[in-house]
Amino acid sequence: MTQPERQHWPLAIGPHVGNLCVDPDDEGEEAIDHNFAPTRRVTDGEVAVDTGEFTLTVVSTHGHTSNHMCVALAQERALFSGGHVMGWSTTVVSPPDGDMETYMESLRKLQRRNDYILWPTHGGPITNAQAYLAQYLQHRLDREAQILQCLADSVTTIAGMVATLYSDVRVELHRAAGRSVLSHLIKLIGEGRVVVADGSAPRGAAEFVLVE
């Protein structure tokens, strides 16, 4: 598993792979399925599977969740990217388990690799891996700039930012979009560029202002 979410596929595939199901060594928070028990836990760089014909190596990519990992198939320069990079949309980074600063650094980590193809959990295969990763990271940088512009234009709430920035997105997806906006704002607060207006902790209902 690339992350211990509340999903059912480990039970479905277990009998076909000798019930081998590996999972990141560090415990996640928000999205974790506490009832899931992996066969063993693995760490970054560990060869999780070695058949003699191919190997599967762990690539820690925290950020989407606190313990997310990808899995590399070196013999095909392929990377199973889980929920870290998706083939049909951008990834939600939802605090507190998701962390935007860590997520963006994990994207840069993948850019330093030489994978040819990405196999995401959601969406089809991505054959232009490096170009796609660059686009994915640039999207986050662009969104960050748009959030800063919203604040400069006195749009100080997450609800207002979502209405402005995601006007072309279905309303039922706005809640998830708001979680990623909050994650961006937490990153900007950590960088000293934004503060919560009343000095409280960042949260979905807070108002945010630029640091002058």
What are these regions (language model features)?
Residues 1, 80-82, 173:
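Short hydrophobic/aromatic-enriched beta-strand-loop microsegments
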Residues 10-39, 48, 55-144:
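Metallo-beta-lactamase
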Residues 42-43:
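Hydrophobic residues at beta-strand termini and immediately following loops
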Residues 47, 115-116, 156, 193:
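Generic structural signal for secondary-structure transition and capping sites
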Residues 149-212:
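C-terminal regulatory/interaction regions
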